[in-house]
Amino acid sequence: MDEDVLKEAIEQYKQQIIQIQTVLESGQIEGRAELAKLKDDLTELIQVTEESLLSLKKSQLLQLLEQQESSHHDSGTPETDTKTSVDYRNSYVNDHTIDDNDDEDNDENIIGTKCRVAFTQEWGVKEHHNAMVFKLESIPLDEETVDQAKVRVLFLNPTHRSMVPCPYFLEGKCKFAGAECRFSHGYLVDVEHLKPFKEPDFSSVKAGQRCLARYSDGVWYNSTIKSIKHESHEFLIHYETYNTDATLPLDDIYPLGPEEVESDSESDSQSDTGDSSSSKAAIEQDDDVIRYAWKPTGALSSLGDWEQHTKGIGSKLMAKMGYIFGKGLGKDGEGRVEPIEVVVLPQGKSLDKCAELREKNKLKEPFKRKKKKLVVASTTSASQGKASDVFDFINHKLGHSKGSLHDLRVSHPGAKPDIRKTRKSADENTNWNIQLFKIHEEISSVKKQLNKQEEALQRHTTRDSRNKTIFTEKRDSVHNRLQELLKKEKKIQEKIHQKDQHRKLTVF
């Protein structure tokens, strides 16, 4: 069916429901039960049609992806795919679809690594939170340049609903994009910005201490420990947000240290529910330092050295004005010889405060950020070596603290996805006609997918045998799905026939 036809059908069904609702509200007694049943059937039919519309949009998207994939394969040149010179696109396909077993093993080793990342809330509060690596991603910049290595992390102690991992996303069933979903689909972080995981310290936990406690909605709120049951390892805590008490196990508590409590009290003025996991005192102390953005090396020849990367217009202008290289500036050549350093003053500080910092020699050398980038290698061995460097960097920086994605999936109460009913085989009130209509729509969609897979397989029949094997497996998978749907269709038709025969016998 066309997308516009389905939308028009949905609008017609809604108009019919409005008309039926008007008749029911008028107070007529005759046929009231039939109208109510008709209204329920129309409501269910609207739901089925909307699902069909959604599957149609998905099939269109899959068609677009298949076209891109086929064009991606057609652009390759297998003749030039040698060990010494590999085309970028062919190497990417071969490395990531067939010969990427080592990278997949490395990905599995990285997944679940615990770390600590900086996160800025929507209201501007910057905090540090414990997290766990969910996936390793690389953002391509250019075919001839490098890939920027990033990881997608999930927060272990989310302090806001937008940070709670989406349960449907973890199951691979979420219908919303990351920005549209009210829960988190992961947070992208540069590998170089990852910090070591901070283990909760239960050695000095006592009554009256501040902590983060998990609530029924999966969010960790600011709380206070009232008492401790040492035998059962349970805590009686008081939620400050809800003003209620609860008894929680050890896994639902995250004790806050003195620095975290201090930073939390400072951030409460900006947010009602925000919790800071890093010390703002250390940040403010770091802001009171004058930094050199650039500082000369001290050699006399350093003046103008940067012009080897430019046209040297500055040196030419100075030479026209009579400047002799090696001497100082000024009329008599007694001025400064070295270039002027670039100084970045602390933001929001007065000149008197900056002068005081100069006297205290609080001058900080510029730091160079070590950017770890995933280089796209021309050979398989080179790409595996670079990927292992990123993995080694993560393991070296974060240690070997590992977690389980299953713990995130079932960690917070009420976060499990609801089990939706797909078929009521034993229910007498099941509308088998609607089920049959739904199966017909799905069969039609799968047949279209099967035709596309067969066309793609025919295009790659005379080409690389490895690509042919991939498309053959895809075709067989879609064909098996079609056979399952045909069996379901046959069973539903038998159910409808039995129901009709039973009704005829009952009337007789």
From Swiss-Prot:
A single GO cellular-component term from the record reads: nucleus
Annotated region Disordered: the residues are: 67-86, 253-282, 404-426
| Signal sequence bounds | none
- Positions with biased composition (Basic and acidic residues): 69-86
Tell me the Gene Ontology biological-process terms attached to this UniProt entry. Answer: negative regulation of transcription by RNA polymerase II
Q: What is this protein called?
A: Zinc finger CCCH-type with G patch domain-containing protein
**Biased composition annotated in UniProt, kind: Acidic residues:** 259-269
Subcellular compartments: Nucleus
Q: Which Gene3D superfamilies match?
A: 2.30.30.1190, 2.30.30.140
In terms of Pfam families, this protein maps to:
G-patch (PF01585)
Zinc fingers (C3H1-type): give the ranges.
161-188
Keyword Transport in the entry? The reply is: no
Ordered alphabetically, the record's keywords are: DNA-binding, Metal-binding, Nucleus, Repressor, Transcription, Transcription regulation, Zinc, Zinc-finger
- Any idea which GO molecular function terms this record carries? DNA-binding transcription repressor activity, RNA polymerase II-specific; RNA polymerase II cis-regulatory region sequence-specific DNA binding; zinc ion binding
Functional description taken from the UniProt entry: Transcription repressor.
* Ranges for domain G-patch: 310-356
Record bears the keyword rRNA-binding: no
Compositional bias of kind Low complexity:
270-279
